[in-house]
Amino acid sequence: MGQKINPLGFRLGTTQDHHSLWFSQPKNYSESLQEDKKIRDFIKNYVQNNMIKASGAEGIARIYIQKRIDLIQVVIFMGFPKLLIETRPQGIKELQRTLQKEFNFGNQKLNITITRIEKPYGNPNILAEFIAVQLKNRVSFRKAMKKAIELAEQADTKGIQVQIAGRVDGKEIARVEWIREGRVPRQTIRANLDYCSYPVRTIYGVLGVKIWIFLDQAK
């Protein structure tokens, strides 16, 4: 059942790194872990509520959190930072203040920075958001999948696999549809593979979108 494992956790320490970096006492570990989840959810909700409405996607690839004794460093990797910054020039400072109010960090200073991703459509999270917007707008799932693959190919990826599961096109019986282009070596640990699982809420129910992107082979 090797194919059932999460491709990112499978490659930790080889081609993947942890998205959180901190040390904690065993008794405080679960609290710190929950705090990370809450911070990520809060940032995603804030970006969703304050971005340009026409875009329909957050454009967040991942959120990296590093905690020290006196500092909490949050780095937001975004494909389209203009979506947030153009509407509110003081967006980052405002987010920082709101986050500080929401969470009691005590003596720890909070620092938030935004890093732009060069090729946004080479990231599975941003591609999954793109597919979600298409499906919510009643675009055919095949058309949405093919367009996503075209965008990924323009971002110089070696291979991509897109899978949609659930009541596809509103059919009564749930099924799994997938499409692959190029190489996607899911069993090779040295393969630099990026992965994302994304739920899409449609009028027919929840669809599960999964995307595997093969970037490169680790030396």
Curated annotation (Swiss-Prot):
Domain KH type-2 positions: 43-118
GO CC terms, sorted: cytosolic small ribosomal subunit; plastid
UniProt organism field: Cuscuta exaltata
Transmembrane segments: none
InterPro entries xref list: KH_dom-like_a/b (IPR015946), KH_sf_prok-type (IPR009019), Ribosomal_S3_C_sf (IPR036419), Ribosomal_uS3_bac-typ (IPR005704), Ribosomal_uS3_C (IPR001351), Ribosomal_uS3_CS (IPR018280)
The protein, known as: Small ribosomal subunit protein uS3c
GO biological process: one example: translation
Keywords associated with the record: Plastid, Ribonucleoprotein, Ribosomal protein, RNA-binding, rRNA-binding
HAMAP family: Ribosomal_uS3_B
Signal peptide positions on this chain: none
Subunit structure: Part of the 30S ribosomal subunit.
NCBIfam families for this protein: rpsC_bact
One term of GO molecular function: structural constituent of ribosome
Sequence similarity: Belongs to the universal ribosomal protein uS3 family.
Compartments it resides in: Plastid
